[in-house]
């Protein structure tokens, strides 16, 4: 399970260094292989390959009226491998789709990650906190 936020930097080639606390898990779980695709909220999703295959199969079974979502998730997916330095390459197309420049935030979201432009994530997080908790969390106990 992946959790926590990491402030990272994309290098000039679009490579991102995976935080060391996740590298061993990604090597063990996925042999360093990950899949990156678009997320409807304007960030990118980064899956260890076995988790991607589960997600991909769910998306593939969506009904015909969700064909555009299949295109968004599956048609934009790119398989990448961590290099010897623990970096993954985020393609130019996906960097553009996620609005990623240089400063990024990698969020561990359980079985996958979200990759955000750092400023965009900070603004969206601040807006969500200003709105207060949604009804779904009203009975949630901390």
Swiss-Prot record:
GO biological process: negative regulation of DNA-templated transcription initiation
Gene3D superfamilies in the record: Transcriptional regulator MraZ domain
Keywords, comma-separated and alphabetical: Cytoplasm, DNA-binding, Repeat, Transcription, Transcription regulation
InterPro entries in alphabetical order: MraZ, MraZ_C, MraZ_dom, MraZ_N, MraZ_sf, SpoVT-AbrB_dom, SpoVT-AbrB_sf
Pfam family, one: MraZ
Main location: cytoplasm
Boundaries of every SpoVT-AbrB domain copy: 5-51, 77-120
GO cellular component annotations of the record: cytoplasm; nucleoid
GO terms assigned for molecular function: DNA-binding transcription factor activity; transcription cis-regulatory region binding
Subcellular location(s) of the protein: Cytoplasm, Nucleoid
HAMAP family for the chain: MraZ (MF_01008)
Family: Belongs to the MraZ family.
Description of how the protein assembles with itself and partners: Forms oligomers.
Protein name: Transcriptional regulator MraZ
Species, as recorded: Paraburkholderia phytofirmans (strain DSM 17436 / LMG 22146 / PsJN) (Burkholderia phytofirmans)
Lineage: Bacteria, Pseudomonadati, Pseudomonadota, Betaproteobacteria, Burkholderiales
Recorded name of the encoding gene: mraZ
């Amino acid at each position: 399970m992946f959790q926590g936020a990491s402030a990272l930097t994309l290098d000039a080639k679009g490579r991102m260094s995976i935080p060391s606390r996740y590298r061993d898990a990604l090597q063990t779980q996925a042999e360093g292989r990950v899949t990156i695709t678009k997320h409807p909220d304007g960030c990118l999703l980064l899956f260890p390959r076995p988790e991607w295959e589960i997600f991909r199969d769910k998306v593939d079974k969506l009904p015909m009226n969700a064909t555009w979502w299949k295109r968004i998730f599956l048609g934009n997916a790119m398989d990448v491998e961590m290099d010897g330095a623990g970096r993954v390459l985020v393609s130019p197309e996906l960097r553009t789709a996620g609005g990623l420049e240089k400063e990024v935030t990698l969020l561990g979201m359980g079985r996958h990650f979200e990759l955000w432009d750092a400023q965009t994530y900070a603004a969206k997080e601040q807006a969500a906190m200003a709105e207060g908790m949604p009804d779904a969390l009203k009975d949630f106990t901390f």
